[in-house]
């Protein structure tokens, strides 16, 4: 009997040790870059990433690797196998013309589904445009998206009756739930979205996702604000929590109150905590260091874009705007030094 009891204790300790070992406290999250839209008048660079999304993830204890949308499939898949989750940020992308971007989106979606179906834990998060992308990928059509009058518009959420039992909301503190439900702290800034009616009539969507919150736009039309997958760690929101702590355009309807900051922090903490359950890792530390966002400099772009900071990438040279200018200056100085040395040599 004592031996049996000892065996039970041993198995219990081993199982808990394994559980502890599955928690990854050094998560690395990939954030997808985007092609420059016509609304951003930048004359160089072929990718960009708003710095607020990087800060959003870093504030919850994760590091960031940019996922360049125009990389080849093999390079992208290699990255996916080493990071612990992916964030699809908000932005402005024309799905009809940006073929390579949509191709990369599809690769991401197929990978996320495949590994999660096969028992790997690999979270995906979408914000604003990211929600539109996730529902379109699952519906296998961008036609599920509808026009909405929801730009520069802060409102409370209308939670569904299953929201508080959901993965994303069940551990949310009551004060944050009350703020989200009663205060205008969710900043919407989107032309498109998905209506509950479209969702309910699409089995690819309603069998895959649970709707946790909705809103009404300025014209009274209802759109979906918060969804999560029924079976996998896939989450999407239509509003911009990252704007509350990191965006300061005075004409934006962004709420910067303490409650809005708490709501943002809850969302970022939740997602990053989900990525801690992923056991992906970089086997080569040098590859990790070279991949991190720290290798790039954000550029202050408020005057041009009303967005404080943007990472500008030129994947043909792998430089940011700041790196590019520094290299140019360095090259000019080097040329001058060599020229002077040649003159002195022949004197």
Swiss-Prot record:
One of its GO terms (biological process) is tetrahydrofolylpolyglutamate metabolic process. It is an enzyme of class 3 (hydrolase). It catalyses: (6S)-5,6,7,8-tetrahydrofolyl-(gamma-L-Glu)(n) + (n-1) H2O = (6S)-5,6,7,8-tetrahydrofolate + (n-1) L-glutamate. Residues 1-22 form the signal peptide. Its EC number is 3.4.19.9. PANTHER family: FOLATE GAMMA-GLUTAMYL HYDROLASE (PTHR11315:SF0), PROTEASE FAMILY C26 GAMMA-GLUTAMYL HYDROLASE (PTHR11315). Glycans are attached at residues 152, 158, 201, 273, 314, 318. This is Gamma-glutamyl hydrolase B. GO terms for molecular function: gamma-glutamyl-peptidase activity; omega peptidase activity. Residues 23-314 form the Gamma-glutamyl hydrolase domain. The keyword Hydrolase applies. It is found in: Secreted, Extracellular space. Belongs to the peptidase C26 family. The gene is gghB.
């Amino acid at each position: 009997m004592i031996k049996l009891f000892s065996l039970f204790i041993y198995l219990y300790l081993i199982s808990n040790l394994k559980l502890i070992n599955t928690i990854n406290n050094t998560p690395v999250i990939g954030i997808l870059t985007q092609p420059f839209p016509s609304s951003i008048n930048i004359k160089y660079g072929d990718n960009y990433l708003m710095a607020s999304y990087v800060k959003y993830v870093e504030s919850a204890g994760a590091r960031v690797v940019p996922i360049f949308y125009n990389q080849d499939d093999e390079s992208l898949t290699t990255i996916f196998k080493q990071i612990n989750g992916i964030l699809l940020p908000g932005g402005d992308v024309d799905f009809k013309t940006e073929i390579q971007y949509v191709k990369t989106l599809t690769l991401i979606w197929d990978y996320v589904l495949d590994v999660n179906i096969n028992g790997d834990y690999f979270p995906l998060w979408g914000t604003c445009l990211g929600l539109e992308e996730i529902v379109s990928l699952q519906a296998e059509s961008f036609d599920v998206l509808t026009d909405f009058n929801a730009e520069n518009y802060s409102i409370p959420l209308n939670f569904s009756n299953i929201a508080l039992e959901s993965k994303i909301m069940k551990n949310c503190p009551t004060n944050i739930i009350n703020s989200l439900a009663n205060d205008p702290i969710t900043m919407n800034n989107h032309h498109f979205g998905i209506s509950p009616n479209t969702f309910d009539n699409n089995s690819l969507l309603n069998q895959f996702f649970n709707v946790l919150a909705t809103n009404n736009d300025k014209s009274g039309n209802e759109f979906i604000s918060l969804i999560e997958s029924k079976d996998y760690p896939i989450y999407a929101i239509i509003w911009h929590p990252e704007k509350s702590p990191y965006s300061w355009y005075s004409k934006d309807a962004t709420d910067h109150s303490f409650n809005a900051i708490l709501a943002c922090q809850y969302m970022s903490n939740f997602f990053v905590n989900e990525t801690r359950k992923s056991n992906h890792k970089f086997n080569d530390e040098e590859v990790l260091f070279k991949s991190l966002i720290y290798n790039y400099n954000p550029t202050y772009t408020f005057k041009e874009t009303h967005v404080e900071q943007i990472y500008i990438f030129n994947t043909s040279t792998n430089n940011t705007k700041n790196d590019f200018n520094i290299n140019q200056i360095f090259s000019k100085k080097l040329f001058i030094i060599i020229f002077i040395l040649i003159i002195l040599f022949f004197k």
